[in-house]
A protein has these predicted regions:
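Short glycine- and acidic-rich boundary segments immediately preceding or forming the N-terminal edge
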Residues: 58-99
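Active-site-proximal beta-strand/loop segments in catalytic clefts of secreted hydrolases
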Residues: 125-128, 151-155, 177-180, 228-232, ...
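C-terminal domain-boundary segment and adjacent tail
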Residues: 109-115, 144, 158, 292-352
């Protein structure tokens, strides 16, 4: 029994020795797979960038025919818009407008683009920026977390550039409404300049372009290729001109006629009655008008209570200005003396 047990043990040891020798031989030829090393903080990213650079360098080396590799990167996610007002109108839908060819909007003049659904409205404000009235409109829009299109007058923009910057900073679209709010079917009129009404002769195209350049200067950044004719008087040759400039033309579906009203409740009643009749539409208001500024909050409250939804129209690309008009505006707003220095380097608050 003992001899048999000893023999079995020796056999097991012999087999183990044989298999161990085979294993050692194999590992000495191929070697074990290396364990992945943990990168120190920052090393992993640097390595990935380096590898990408080497691949790109190899692909774009002189004499190679292979095209460079383009790596698509996801755009940063937009920060969600929060509204502290649970009863705010908000923005139900945002639409992007390709202004190529100068499309027209507003069924009072244009019938091509019926994109609004029942109960949807677009808020638009003309003739600003103007002290007190425009800030009241902006405050109401902000309280309701909603957006609008503004069509400022170029001359007003040069008076209140800081105010127009606030409009743009609020996320609203900023179009234009000529330089001095003239009837573009004519070439003579009157313009309120420096607090005085003066006889005024003009070229209609100059009126359009000076207004665009003035608004762009006042905002200090991109503005929308959106235009509205004063008094909605739209000569065909200027419609064609704006089409070549790729600027969309805005008429209206619902004119509030707030410029005829002195009381905020009249403006509200006008808008709500017309919406009840039409059910949807582009609404024309004026942030220049006191009654509209004073009643803006109540009007938005009424729109919310009635279940209307705001659609925000934003441009696919910004408007382009014409250099000669930009230069003319700069001469007008800066005067004959300008050293080119920013105001912050000339005027500094040292006590307050």
């Amino acid at each position: 029994m003992r001899l048999a047990a000893i023999a079995s043990a020796l056999a097991i040891l012999l087999c183990a020795a044989v298999f161990g020798a085979i294993f050692l031989q194999r590992t000495s030829v191929s070697g074990p797979a290396p364990s992945p090393a943990l990168a120190a903080p920052g090393e992993e990213q640097a390595s990935a960038i380096g590898a990408s650079a080497r691949v790109d360098a190899a692909r774009t080396a002189p004499g190679t025919t292979e095209q460079p590799m383009v790596v698509a990167q996801a755009a940063p996610a937009a920060a969600p818009t929060t509204c502290s007002n649970p009863n705010g109108l908000g923005v139900a839908r945002t639409v992007e407008i390709d202004t190529t060819g100068g499309p027209g909007f507003g069924f009072e003049h244009f019938k091509s683009h019926d994109f609004l659904r029942e109960g949807e409205i677009v808020l638009t404000f003309d003739d600003g920026p103007w002290p007190k009235n425009t800030p009241n409109v902006l405050a109401a829009l902000a309280a309701h977390c909603t957006k609008a299109i503004f069509f400022p007058i170029g001359l007003h923009a040069t008076y209140e550039p800081g105010l127009l910057k606030q409009v743009a900073a609020g996320g609203h679209a900023v179009g234009s409404h000529t330089w001095c709010h003239q009837d573009l079917s004519k070439t003579k009129g009157k313009c309120l300049i420096g607090g005085k009404t003066q006889a005024y002769e003009y070229d209609p195209k100059d009126e359009i372009e000076k207004g665009i350049s003035a608004v762009r200067w006042a905002v200090g950044g991109p503005t929308a290729p959106f235009f509205r004719f004063p008094a909605l008087r739209q000569p065909q040759e200027l419609i064609d001109y704006l089409g070549k400039r790729n600027i969309a033309i805005f008429s209206t579906d619902l004119d509030s006629f707030d410029f005829k009203m002195r009381k905020p409740e009249q403006v509200r009643q006008s808008v709500m009655a017309k919406l009840k009749k039409h059910g949807k539409g582009i609404v024309l208001l004026h942030d220049f008008q006191h009654a509209t500024g004073e009643g803006a909050m109540d009007l938005l409250n009424d729109l919310k209570a009635a279940g209307y939804k705001v659609v925000f129209m934003k441009p696919k690309f910004p408007v382009t200005t014409i250099a000669s008009y930009d230069e003319a505006i700069m001469k007008q707003v800066k005067g004959p003396v300008s050293d080119g220095r920013p105001t912050s380097s000339v005027v500094r608050t040292i006590s307050e």
